[in-house]
Amino acid sequence: MLTILFLGDIVGEPGRNAVISRLPELKAKYGVDFIIVNGENAAGGRGITGKITIDLLRSGVSVITTGDHIWDQKEISAFIETEPRLLRPINYPEGAPGHGSIVLETTQGKVGVINVQCRTFMLPILENPFRVMQAAVEKMRTETSVIVVDVHGETTSEKIALGRFLAGKVSAVLGTHTHVQTADEQIFPGGTAFLCDAGMCGPVNSIIGRAVEPIVQRFISNLPAQFPVATGEVRLRGALVEIDETTGRALRISRIDEAAASSGESQSEGTLENEYKNEQENG
């Protein structure tokens, strides 16, 4: 069995520091074999830098996915060509820097990751994700049956539609972008784990990771404003997916909601964690 930890959008320094500090403990706690994080908001809430990419990979992250903010830091266009484990959405036009997919060798066999961006209410409007994914999955399945897809999109309907479209063809379809964790984790027919949105790794006393007051005032005044990353309590949210490495079928999916501090420093919320422990103990 292959256990994959997938963490939602990392927001700014609070989010990335929490991920880096907690990853070793989470890896041991859940028996994680492979770690995927969405890093498109890791640099001050907008984009990602080369240094942040390296820091995350050194901390134990296997693959970093992104989305519509991938190009927000100017340096990334050149850097992404040098680091294949940093993905941009696969449905950018041909010739865009970097790659939208990767297959990595692990002790449990090969694991494929594909990053795709939806189109509804999303800018820039990229190539049709359904058509692009059909071709990408067919190609990747010649190398491995274990395929995890990060679907970066605004609407639940488009992400669910992509999940249904890929059911039975990939191991997991996990949504990112909204920073709000959904409660619809399930396994589609054919063994594809699905979660509409993994949520974020960032400050919870916020509006999707940003300071509250500037955003509220923006809605009131319609005037331009800066939205700094919030401070305070940080939580790590995402999903844990267990996969049969031979067939590529998902066996189980559960949501993750962990405190930034280790269990020895601060008590985690515990509901999902306790459910996981009980299931493990009861076989």
Model regions: which residues?
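Acidic, metal/ion-coordinating pockets
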Residues: 1-283
